[in-house]
Amino acid sequence: MSNVAVINQQHRLIKITSSADIVLIGAGIMSATFGMFLTILEPTWRIHIYERLSQPAQESSNVWNNAGTGHAAFCELNYTQYNNKNCSVDISKAIAVNEAFEISRQFWAYLVEIKVLKYPSSFINNVPHMSFVWGEENVCFLKKRFQALLNSVLFSGMVYSEDLQQIRQWTPLIIDGRNVSQKIAATRMEMGTDVNFGALTQQLLNELKKNVNFKMYLQHDVVSVQNNNDATWDVHVIDRRCKHKKCIRTNYVFIGAGGRSLNLLQTSGIPEVYGYAGFPVGGQFLVTKNPKIVEQHLAKVYGKASVNAPPMSVPHIDTRILNGEKILLFGPFATFSSKFLKYGSWLDLFHSLNKHNVIPILQAGIDNFDLIKYLISQLVMSNMNRIDELREYYPTVNPSDWTLVTAGQRVQIIKRNSNRRGILQFGTEVVNSGDGTLSALLGASPGASTVVSIILQLLNTMFNNKINSDVWKNKLIDMIPSYTKNLNGDLILVNKIRQYTCNALKLNYIEAIDR
């Protein structure tokens, strides 16, 4: 196909300015990872990334717009559900999240081996993951959770304690100044990690740019995606530097534009998006760089969300490693705006509303009134209120040491359930066109940590005829040694994989053992 062509398609005159095998919308961790997979699997494919901002990884992937937790379900209590009827703890989601993160680590280890990623410590470092609770009921839950998780080899090495001095040894900051009569408990997983997804994204894109078949266009705003009779897609773009309009014809489209994915998916007109809506929620964190405070805490400590609060509100006080510097952050504190992106438009929410999703979003609002009350309470919160919440995790806090930082926007999914009623769904979800040539990623956490599992899902949907070929299978096994296998329940494989990834990524290896 020539660079410029004029085609009469469905009675509309279209000026095709370029063509590609696949267009990736958004220059964040998802598109960068997808682009790297495709470059390895099909080096001759023409891959285009379009990003509306002047730099990549400036929205959810930016280091200041997420907490950097390598989500492995070691410390996040919302990945394990307590069943009041039989007093059991369901760990199925924790296992799924953990396996997904192990898959991401394998791919990163492979990229280190082939010199695509050169300095692992620039994007991943060991920071122990801890859960910390107080009160009789919460302590009971954490103990049951710990006992349930030990039934999986994936959580071998987790330690539980109710001893104040033991917990103080792990992280003095959360214990010093605390009432010694308070009932507390904690779990600790030494092999937890802190991940800089912004640095990882930048390194992937820097390597991709060496491929002559890869093109990245910054300050290019994708405004719509339209399908053609021949199963191709026209991606309509505005060059924000000169306001020129462009149209790119492509065989495949992936929309990895964070909060904007829903709006762009709606322009495609595919019926699969009918009924989907989005609910934007932002976040803020208290941050300190004071070395006297930072040195008292080397952990990501997750607590338990308050009653009626959503999963995304789980408070945590974290060590973060940014360009070699350690800082602490505490939060999140919810914010609300109608923007779907941090650098988005106030009209994003309103542009996403249509006849297919107005009813579902109203139903979800009625059914989640507790969430609305929670958001209101967060919006009227004063800085001293925030410090009071921090004091529950850091009893001797000095307010003058902490600064409030605004993080990124997340768009929670609203969709119809089996009863055709709109429900609020936390997490991430891939929406595909019927023929698999267009896919979009919607939702939020634990997205970035599970990026490679999501890409494998996309490959299976979009390139089903290729993923089962010997050529692709062999390459995928090279990239992900546990590909097609389950880690849970396989002690030998878990240790083999973890030893491999830890060696490559310069992380601490702890041998898993049978109970």
Swiss-Prot record:
- Give the enzyme's main class according to its UniProt record, as a single word: oxidoreductase
Q: Which InterPro entries match?
A: FAD/NAD-bd_sf (IPR036188), MQO (IPR006231)
- Cofactor(s) the protein needs: FAD
Q: Which UniProt keywords apply?
A: FAD, Flavoprotein, Oxidoreductase, Tricarboxylic acid cycle
Q: Give the EC number.
A: 1.1.5.4
Q: Which GO terms describe its biological process?
A: tricarboxylic acid cycle
Q: In which pathway does it act?
A: Carbohydrate metabolism; tricarboxylic acid cycle; oxaloacetate from (S)-malate (quinone route): step 1/1
Q: Tell me what reaction this enzyme catalyses.
A: (S)-malate + a quinone = a quinol + oxaloacetate
Asked if the keyword Flavoprotein belongs to this entry, the reply reads yes
Cross-referenced Pfam families, in alphabetical order? Mqo (PF06039)
Q: What GO MF annotations does this protein's record show?
A: 2-hydroxyglutarate dehydrogenase activity; L-malate dehydrogenase (quinone) activity
Among its keywords, does the record have Oxidoreductase?
yes
What's this protein's family per the entry?
A: Belongs to the MQO family.
Extract the HAMAP family matched here: MQO (MF_00212)
- PANTHER family, per database record: L-2-HYDROXYGLUTARATE DEHYDROGENASE, MITOCHONDRIAL (PTHR43104:SF2)
Q: What is this protein called?
A: Probable malate:quinone oxidoreductase
Q: Which organism is it from?
A: Blochmanniella pennsylvanica (strain BPEN)
